[in-house]
Amino acid sequence: MTATAQQLEYLKNSIKSIQDYPKPGILFRDVTSLLEDPKAYALSIDLLVERYKNAGITKVVGTEARGFLFGAPVALGLGVGFVPVRKPGKLPRETISENYDLEYGTDQLEIHVDAIKPGDKVLVVDDLLATGGTIEATVKLIRRLGGEVADAAFIINLFDLGGEQRLEKQGITSYSLVPFPGH
């Protein structure tokens, strides 16, 4: 099933836009409204599974927290394992970490050291691509463990915030179902 314009429009219309959230001047794209619509949620998963079913993916990595909501069902659909990337102190086994920059300060992500094996072909899944900082840190973690990042997939791409270009500089291609301008 290749995504049709009608299907993609349905997904786009299922995502509510909230003006001035979380602060004035921001137009927030609320992916949780897509999750509330079982047809839209299933369609988003089905389209990603269809796109990657013959790509030789061996692991799907999802970033905390909404990346779990899309990454885990995509992993099930592909018949591969799901690996969570989390904020510090949330994973019980030995981890490695990677810092990344935020608008005001830094944050950190962690992954279990035994979750990715050398040679694993990894699909990174998250709900939204904005500046790309979270995904760039996730890619670095995967590569440090010997994994190959095959692609990064998103439900939403805020295309004018530079995330795609940032990932391209890391040699990562990306795919998104719904483009929106970023605000």
UniProtKB/Swiss-Prot annotation:
This is Adenine phosphoribosyltransferase. Its EC number is 2.4.2.7. Homodimer. It catalyses: AMP + diphosphate = 5-phospho-alpha-D-ribose 1-diphosphate + adenine. One of its GO terms (biological process) is purine ribonucleoside salvage. It is found in: Cytoplasm. PROSITE patterns: PUR_PYR_PR_TRANSFER (PS00103). GO terms for molecular function: adenine phosphoribosyltransferase activity. InterPro entries: Ade_phspho_trans, Adenine_PRTase, PRibTrfase_dom, PRTase-like. It comes from Shigella flexneri. Disulfide bonds: none annotated. Belongs to the purine/pyrimidine phosphoribosyltransferase family. It holds the Pfam family Pribosyltran. The lineage of its organism: Bacteria, Pseudomonadati, Pseudomonadota, Gammaproteobacteria, Enterobacterales. NCBIfam families: apt, PRK02304.1-1, PRK02304.1-2, PRK02304.1-3, PRK02304.1-5. Catalyzes a salvage reaction resulting in the formation of AMP, that is energically less costly than de novo synthesis. SUPFAM superfamilies: PRTase-like. It comes from the Bacteria. GO terms for cellular component: cytosol. Keywords: Cytoplasm, Glycosyltransferase, Purine salvage, Transferase.
